[in-house]
């Protein structure tokens, strides 16, 4: 295998027709892939923050309706998710910067949200890759992680949108029907430490998970589709995890 084909396979997405012949020097080609920021891509036709919000509200409202309403609402969400997948595949099949697209795919997998796990995540996954992964793929990791933590797709996927500081005003005001207060959800904090950053052998403790979860309380979703921070849900006072505020 010659150097050009090796570079296209290892660092890109394989050779498109004629691409191998156009590349004269594989090292220069690879360096050129990193020139400029990551290419931006547009959302599929008809997929807007408003249409996503409408579709997700329909899913929630359909829970109180009949079976046909639920099927119709879920079908719209699935269709939006499918159009996002087609959009992404089209970009990767035609891009002139396959190394960047490979990096986008890598980081989308590392900081993944599952479209099959929760119906609320499916129509948001495309926006997550466009607005979280792509803008930071050639930048700082911490900026990407912070953007990931605040995006509605991640807030829904790992339940941080409903995490409430146990002694917060939000917990006191929002008791469940059985009289129990809404409380702390550790799902995202654990994932952030175990998979996204430090790793399973990263030296953190269960107390670190709990303190990080408290720091992250109040990061929620404004209606459906927008990130918001709500102080009344936050754990008080401010906590520390592994010595850092």
What spans do the regions from the language model cover?
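Structural motif
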Residues: 1-3, 94-99, 183, 203-206
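Flexible, low-complexity segments enriched for small/polar residues
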Residues: 5-21
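Short alpha-helix boundary/capping elements
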Residues: 12-13, 38, 111, 115, ...
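N-terminal accessory alpha/beta regions
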Residues: 17-136, 161, 167-176
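Active-site substrate-binding loop specific to GH73 endo-beta-N-acetylglucosaminidase modules
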Residues: 121-245
